[in-house]
Amino acid sequence: MSADEQQRYQAQLDEKVDRLSALLSPFNAPKTSVYPSQPTHYRMRAEFRVWHEGDDLFHIMFDQETKEKYRVDSFPPACKTINDAMEKLLNEIRPNEILRKKLFQIDYLSALSGELVISLLYHRQLDDEWEAAAKSLKSTLETHFPKVNIIGRARKQKRIIDNDFVIERLPVKGNEFVFKHIENSFTQPNAEVNCKMIEWALDCVKPLSGDLLEMYCGAGNFSLPLALHFDNVVGTEIAKPSVQAAQFNIEQNRLHNVKIVRLAAEEFTQAMKGKRTFSRLEGIDLSEYNFTTVLVDPPRAGLDEDSLRMIQDYDNIVYISCNPETLAQNLELLSETHDVAQSALFDQFPFTHHIEAGVLLTRKG
């Protein structure tokens, strides 16, 4: 990276740090720890619309301000695997009428492991002729990529040419964790910064003991590494594919103290308070757990008031936020009972407005 690029990167990072610090200042937060990103080739996911122009066909994106389309032949934010695939894929699709007909979008999902899933989205139904062409495409791409899979999507249709997931291997504090990342399910896009987030969370919980509750646990991104520090971990997640991936990940990482339940945060709150029983909690007696710590990684809207009141029951709260504005709103209530002991900024998306943040809250007194 040139000195000019480094300067540009640092300037946008400094602006984010100032913005987060201002939002956290009413809560007497300590100085924010900052975890930078590679300025390019950091994204493990990318999606593009496809534009047809005569015999040509290319990826496009839309300018966020003008809404004008522009051609994208390479995409510096995406990892090198995705960039390599973009050119090679279109070179194969352009002359192939079966693969290009009514193709309107291409999604890429990759991993530090080098695995790749390419999803081709169509405005037409896909038949056996398409599947044969897609298998041939996969064989051709396999000469360049060690493990590549193709998915065809159309209305109410999904054809998978071998797998709809990548197997990721994340290095975290000297351990390697295996994760199945499923196409069209949420995963952290910036794998290297994600590792830093997990390591920060591990540092937060190092002195703690007892059991951990994680809400919005996804495929176990935090639950699994943190299981090494707690007696037991219970994770809640509403998305069925993520729950299934989490079960696979628990087995792959040989963890015996983690349970994932398919409940919304609001439902789990009701179960904890004994207001409702759920068949999905069969075999799990919540009263037997000694939950000392809760980790939440909510969507952009933050936590609802009932969930906030529920997590106030725990001595330690690790809050991962993809929206610092709603984090600050939630802290107004949480700060009645807890102090901000640590704060961190993770630059998941360089050169964008987006901030990923983390705070550790500990009970007052």
From Swiss-Prot:
One of its GO terms (cellular component) is cytosol. S-adenosyl-L-methionine binds at Q188, Y216, N221, E237, D297. GO terms for biological process: tRNA methylation. Pfam families: tRNA_U5-meth_tr. It is an enzyme of class 2 (transferase). Keywords: Methyltransferase, S-adenosyl-L-methionine, Transferase, tRNA processing. One of its GO terms (molecular function) is tRNA (uracil(54)-C5)-methyltransferase activity, S-adenosyl methionine-dependent. The active site is at C322, E356. Signal peptide: none annotated. It catalyses: uridine(54) in tRNA + S-adenosyl-L-methionine = 5-methyluridine(54) in tRNA + S-adenosyl-L-homocysteine + H(+); uridine(341) in tmRNA + S-adenosyl-L-methionine = 5-methyluridine(341) in tmRNA + S-adenosyl-L-homocysteine + H(+). Its EC number is 2.1.1.-, 2.1.1.35. Dual-specificity methyltransferase that catalyzes the formation of 5-methyluridine at position 54 (m5U54) in all tRNAs, and that of position 341 (m5U341) in tmRNA (transfer-mRNA). Belongs to the class I-like SAM-binding methyltransferase superfamily. RNA M5U methyltransferase family. TrmA subfamily. This is tRNA/tmRNA (uracil-C(5))-methyltransferase. It comes from Alteromonas mediterranea (strain DSM 17117 / CIP 110805 / LMG 28347 / Deep ecotype). The gene is trmA.
